[in-house]
Amino acid sequence: MSDTKNLNHNRKKDFLSKEVEHIDITSFDSRKIISSMEKMSFVSRETANASKIYNEMLKDKDCTIFLTLAGSTSAAGCMHIYRDMVKYNMVDAIVATGASIIDMDFFEALGFKHYQGSQYQNDNELRDNYIDRIYDTYIDEEELQVCDKTIGEIADKLEPKSYTSREFIKEIGKYLKTNSKKKGSLIETAFDNDVPIFCPAFTDSSAGFGLVMHQERNPKNHITIDSIREFRELTEIKIKSKGSGLFMIGGGVPKNFIQDTVICAELLGKNVDMHKYAIQITVADSRDGACSSSTLKEASSWGKVDTTKEQWYLLKQPVFYH
């Protein structure tokens, strides 16, 4: 099959006709299928073992659990999984890409949708209709620009000073309490449950476009995002924790940022343990030497993740399929 295939849609509404629906993990009991995987092989058995590690994290009352999000699973139908992890006290803090939090979660909180599409669609035709593609998922670019502008409008109303991404996202949560079109977003749920969200590469998203417009309108009195203070804030959470565990979706900046808190604490002269538990769900190949694909065993050589607890490194797509 060729790389592109014209599906003969000729109007925007034809492309944006089938919404992505987010899976509701509270609507069924997955424990039996997960436990049955213990006797299987490959990713199935790894999934069952990862589940055991996560259950250990939850049972460990001294463990601070960090959820990291990278990639586009939020747009693909997994957003409510992460929301419910916050809602049911299964995570204590989140480190994510700006795209996961703003372009996907905040975007839907404003009432917009992601749509089922095709990876074979002619991308020139999509561009002609102002539609963005994430593999087989479509986004209305006009709606995404509303998201950009809304971020700028939120910034316009804040006191002009420096904010960490956590502080700014908290302001977004406050905004959503009265302005959301879709209730129960990850941002709003985290706001309600006092769970901090950090986006170390915050401006690499719709937030960046919105904040650039904000600064253009307010050249002398505007907000800024202080990523250094943000790193210190996250490190302080690690320092104050008796133990910690990582549940990592994808890799990238969020993965490295949370792991580096151990090194930062050491450089500040603090005696902290490495992350005790770690699970990574990814499709990256460790042979390319990239951060996203690096194994958790490799992270132990940097002093980031302890090897005393079994760690699991899983393929993202099969795990979410199960």
Feature names for model-found ranges:
Residues 2-18, 243, 267-322:
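C-terminal functional extensions of proteins
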Residues 2-51, 55-58:
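N-terminal glycine-rich anion-binding loop in soluble enzyme alpha/beta folds
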Residues 51-64, 189-191, 236-243:
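Glycine-rich phosphate/diphosphate-binding loops that line cofactor/substrate pockets in enzymes
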Residues 65-74, 94, 198-202, 219-291:
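Glycine-rich anion-binding loop/nest that anchors nucleotide
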Residues 81-87, 111, 213-217, 262-269, ...:
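Short, solvent-exposed amphipathic alpha-helical segments in soluble enzyme
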Residues 82-148:
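A generic, well-ordered mixed alpha/beta core segment in the N-terminal half of proteins
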Residues 125-207:
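Ligand-binding beta-strand-loop-alpha-helix segment within the catalytic cores
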